[in-house]
């Protein structure tokens, strides 16, 4: 995705799929992102700056590639992410929900 999106719902990335945010790309700042199945990847490495989403969910075998970008989890509900988070960027948890990270990062 290379454009700013205006939908406010959640985003699901199916197993084996990759959603890559490019220059100027964005997702809803409160929409949940679910990595649903082995090999599902959220790739922020090509984005031009920090990204904010809602809750992050996914099991082992899924991944988030930050590159050098920061990811803010602005959750209003509780979520669990069991996949791997890689890259040199950072992760910030904001909002009123609890985000649990159970994978090796």
Predicted regions: what they are:
Residues 91-97:
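Primary detection of the long, small/polar-rich alpha-helical "axial" segments characteristic
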Residues 1-61, 79-88, 99-105:
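Surface-exposed loop/turn positions within long extracellular repeat scaffolds
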């Amino acid at each position: 995705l290379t454009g700013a999106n205006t939908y406010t719902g959640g985003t699901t990335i199916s197993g084996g799929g990759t959603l890559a945010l490019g220059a100027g790309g964005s997702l809803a700042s409160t929409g949940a992102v679910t990595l649903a199945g082995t090999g599902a990847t959220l790739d922020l490495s090509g984005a031009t700056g920090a990204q904010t989403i809602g809750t992050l969910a996914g099991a082992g075998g899924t991944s988030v590639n930050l590159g050098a970008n920061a990811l803010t989890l602005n959750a209003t509900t509780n979520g669990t992410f069991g996949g791997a988070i890689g890259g040199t960027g950072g992760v910030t948890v904001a909002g009123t929900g609890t985000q649990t990270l159970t994978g090796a990062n």
